[in-house]
Curated annotation (Swiss-Prot):
InterPro entries, A to Z: DnaJ (IPR012724), DnaJ_C (IPR002939), DnaJ_domain (IPR001623), DnaJ_domain_CS (IPR018253), HSP40/DnaJ_pept-bd (IPR008971), HSP_DnaJ_Cys-rich_dom (IPR001305), HSP_DnaJ_Cys-rich_dom_sf (IPR036410), J_dom_sf (IPR036869)
Name of the protein this chain belongs to: Chaperone protein DnaJ
J domain span: 5-70
A GO biological process held by the record: chaperone cofactor-dependent protein refolding
Species assigned in the record: Halorhodospira halophila (strain DSM 244 / SL1) (Ectothiorhodospira halophila (strain DSM 244 / SL1))
Location within or outside the cell: Cytoplasm
Residues binding Zn(2+) 2: 171, 174, 193, 196
Keyword field contains Ion transport: no
Superkingdom classification of source: Bacteria
Length: 385
């Protein structure tokens, strides 16, 4: 995925001072720092992006190279042309012929620079949208309509940034060339004009609607197809649905992040579903059937005699078929044996009679209790010794 513009990452314009860049970096770094967002992978990536942008823009030489050649000027492996158009470089990396012509141009009298403001194209920023889904929709798949905050071209100024009836003025610093020459020792280096950002022109009478930005905030409506089997954390990429590019650049992408809401009955674990099934004490002891919910409707679960609390029964094929993989998951039902409450006098008498019959049989009806009591007895005897 193409890198975002470093100025955009820090939220500053291309004419920002060193102090403004440093202040923006501190604000963004604090916002996305991993210590403040534990376990948030998206914030961790944004923090790395902010740190990388600051390392370049806080260094005068790196910033000059970046302003002139884009990402290729500070990272040859980034690919793409030095002008930011995505072309102009051979397979071996960026073409540095412009660098040498700029450096030696004044020394050997080649004169005049490239002339004329240049309009560097910028790819639009990627957008992220969190979409909440019910478990049923996540499992079966669905189509959702979403409204995404974005920026669109200002209809008042047609993207120029200037008030109707006015035009951008020639930059007084570079005289419309878009470049300025900086003397470094014996060399004269040509670099992007810091005042106009290489455009050669400046908006002096800004459009009141967009305040000279050429773009305004808006919301766009999209229909998103959700494949069956998605889970929390899955991302769906919509190519070209991000922020529009600047100066003819391509648009960014939209990443829809799935977040599945908690369910009344089920908890998901990969392809399997888990649920708690309450069973009364008589059914647990004597056996029977209970009705349990599944995503396909209700089914009867057979409870064998002597079922214990937290015993798990598996209903095969009643889970989820994930996006990646062909195995249909299972539904695991954990038994919760309920102790009766609010007993009548007669019910208490019956339970007391029942308890008396259990004591007469030597505890064989409660193997876990008998085993536990034996262990306690041995522990006390050993402790006394």
């Amino acid at each position: 995925m193409a890198k975002r513009d470093y100025y955009e990452v820090l939220g500053v314009n291309k004419n920002a001072s060193d102090a403004e860049i440093k202040k923006a970096y501190r604000r963004m770094a604090q916002k996305f720092h991993p210590d403040r967002n534990p376990g948030d992978e998206e914030s961790a990536e944004r923090f790395k992006e902010v740190k990388e942008a600051y390392e370049v823009l806080s260094d005068a030489q790196k910033r000059a190279a970046y302003d002139q050649f884009g990402h290729a000027g500070v990272d040859p492996s980034a690919g793409g042309g030095p002008r930011g158009y995505g072309g102009g470089a051979g397979p071996g990396g960026p073409d540095f012929s412009d660098i040498f012509s700029d450096v030696f141009g004044d020394i050997f009298g080649s004169g005049g620079g490239r002339g004329g403001g240049r309009s560097r194209a910028f790819r639009g920023a990627d957008l992220r949208y969190t979409l909440e889904l019910s478990l049923e929709d996540a499992v079966r798949g669905t189509e959702e309509q979403i409204q995404v905050p974005t920026h669109v071209e200002c209809d008042a100024c047609k993207g120029s940034g200037s008030r109707a009836g006015s035009k951008p003025q020639t930059c007084p610093t570079c005289k419309g060339h878009g470049d300025v020459r900086v003397q470094q020792g014996f060399f004269s280096i040509q670099q992007t004009c810091p005042r106009c950002g290489g455009e050669g022109t400046m908006v002096t009478d800004p459009c009141p609607k967009c305040r000279g930005r050429g773009r305004v905030e808006d919301r766009k409506t999209l229909n998103v197809r959700i494949p069956a089997g998605v889970d929390t954390g899955d991302r769906i990429r919509l190519s070209g649905e991000g922020e529009p590019g600047e100066r003819g650049g391509p648009p960014g992408d939209l990443y829809v992040q799935v977040a599945v809401r908690e369910h009344e009955f089920f908890e998901r674990d990969g392809a399997d579903l888990h649920c708690q099934v309450p069973v009364d004490i008589v059914t647990a002891a004597l056996g029977g059937e209970v009705e349990v919910p599944t995503l396909d409707g209700r089914v009867n679960l057979r409870i064998p005699p002597g079922t214990q609390p937290n015993q798990v029964f598996r209903l095969r094929g009643k889970g989820v078929k994930p996006v990646r993989g062909n195995r249909q998951g299972d539904l695991l039902c954990r038994i919760h044996v309920e102790t009766p409450v609010n007993l009548t006098k007669r019910q208490r008498e019956l339970l007391e009679e029942f308890q008396a019959t259990l004591q007469d049989t030597g505890g064989k009806h409660h193997p876990h209790t008998s085993s536990w009591l034996d262990k306690v007895k041995r522990f006390i005897e050993e402790w006394r010794i």
